[in-house]
Structure formats: structure tokens, C-alpha cells
Amino acid sequence: MSWRSEHIWIELLPGSRKISNFCWAFILFLGSLGFLLVGISSYLGRNLISFFPSQQIIFFPQGIVMSFYGIAGLFISSYLWCTISWNVGSGYDLFDRREGIVCIFRWGFPGRNRRIFLRFLIKDIRSVRIEVKEGIYARRVLYMDIRGQRAIPLTRTDENLTPGEIEKKAAELAYFLRVPIEVF
């Protein structure tokens, strides 16, 4: 989602609160809970899950392995739920021609660097760069090259833009910032 006027362009980024992340966290939680319950029911020797008889699974080694997978899945699921609740990766890109500044803000993980805020002068921007990697896992990323610093990615890694969409976005941004486009 973006908002644009003659002198200001604001690009809002959704972060980790996406439907796919909610679905994966929920599916992983239910699956790992099922594995853990089967492992516990094989240890206790009674059915905690009614549609799956625990007598068919002996505790050593199947019950232990299923319990381990269940615990590992719960840890991964809790990690996903934490990134969703903290909304890691969300933020905005602000391009202000009137003031001559670019501000990039992202939310990170809790701690000292939770808020990631970068500010640059527009005159320090060398170019808008498109990096294309073709193959099985095709990847197209839009970068902003800044003098004296490394390139800053402007698109998310999971954002699968078509070549036409990434070119259009790069052309609009380069026109707005009045900088050239580079393709790698």
C-alpha cells in the first residue's frame, strides 16, 4: 500500500502479519500438538486422542521421536506466533523531495534494535537498482544505492514481483527521486 503526492511518497510495508503466516503457525501448532499428544499417550498407555489407539505405538523409539517432533514443532510455532504478534518487518519507506530526505523504518525483534530507522539525503542516492536472479527460485529485488554505504533493499524477500511489476516500480521510484536505474 502506498500514498503519493507531488513531493512525498510513503510506501507502507505489511511485515509478518500475513494470512500465510497465520495459516502456517496454526497448522504447525495443531500438528505438533498432535505429535506431542500421541507421544504422551504412548508413554501413559491410554488414549488421549480417541481416534488413534495408543497401543499401536510403543514408547521406545516411536513415542520418544513423536514427542520430540511435537516439542520442536511447538517451539517453531511459538516463534511464528511471536513474529506475528511483534509484526516483525513492518514499517514504511518515506521519500520526501521537498525536505530532500529518505526515511526507512522497520520493526525488528524486541531488544536494543527493535526500531530500525535509517535516514538519508536524496542527493546521496546514486541509483535505484534491480537485481534479477533467474532459475528455479527466481528472485527480483529492488535496491537503493547510497554513496558510501551498501545497497538497501526496498522490496521484501517473499514479494514475488513479475519483471514488469518490478520494472514499473523501479521506474516510478527513479523518476520520483530523479536518479538513474541500474539492472544487475
Swiss-Prot record:
InterPro entries: PSI_Ycf4_assembly. GO terms for biological process: photosynthesis. Its main location: plastid. Keywords: Chloroplast, Membrane, Photosynthesis, Plastid, Thylakoid, Transmembrane, Transmembrane helix. It is found in: Plastid, Chloroplast thylakoid membrane. GO terms for cellular component: chloroplast thylakoid membrane; photosystem I. Pfam families: Ycf4. The chain crosses the membrane at residues 22-42, 57-77. It is a multi-pass membrane protein. Belongs to the Ycf4 family. PANTHER family: PHOTOSYSTEM I ASSEMBLY PROTEIN YCF4, PTHR33288. Seems to be required for the assembly of the photosystem I complex. This is Photosystem I assembly protein Ycf4. It comes from Ipomoea purpurea.
